[in-house]
Amino acid sequence: MYVILDKDSRVKTKILNAIVEDPEIVLLLKEKYVDEEIWKFCIERDPTLFHKMKHPSESICMFACSVDGSNLKHIKNKFKHILITDVMCFTAVKSNPKAILYVPKAMLNEDLKEMAFDGDPSLMAFFDTVRPEYVARLLVEKPYAVRYVTNLNEDIICEAIKESPSICPYLNHMTPRMLEVLHQYHPAFYNLYKNNDDAINE
């Protein structure tokens, strides 16, 4: 049995065959031959193509954020006809934690920031405030994250030391109180630092 394709179907088939080999070909095609499914196909294979679009729909923008959250930057800076929503921000940050840097200030909240920090603790360095209780929990799970906390204080560090001494090698300085907590909760570990009151890492 033979299926006779109309002209548009044949053209679309040729387009699909071409973009499988090179998704960037989509930029050379007339808009009437490129529907949303073709754009999604291309963006999925090469997320950088998204910012080269002229007039993406909200659906395409949401899809682009799900493929690579950093595409939120292009929606914010270039495609200003698109309304950025809470769902779009969540989708972007879930896909790529660095997307938190492009979330509009009015839509930033602690839950969204902490989801980003869970994926990439270094992002804390871009924010002046992070919830102390979150920092305390994160430092137990990822001691190296102490490098990126901007609002760090002695109380938080002491609580982290109580839970695990593994944070100590990442501290530039240990106060007498920190050493005391280390001695009380992890005496074996304390022996490594008891004669170094000024700094663990110079």
Describe the predicted segments one by one:
Residues 1-202:
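Alpha-helical scaffold segments
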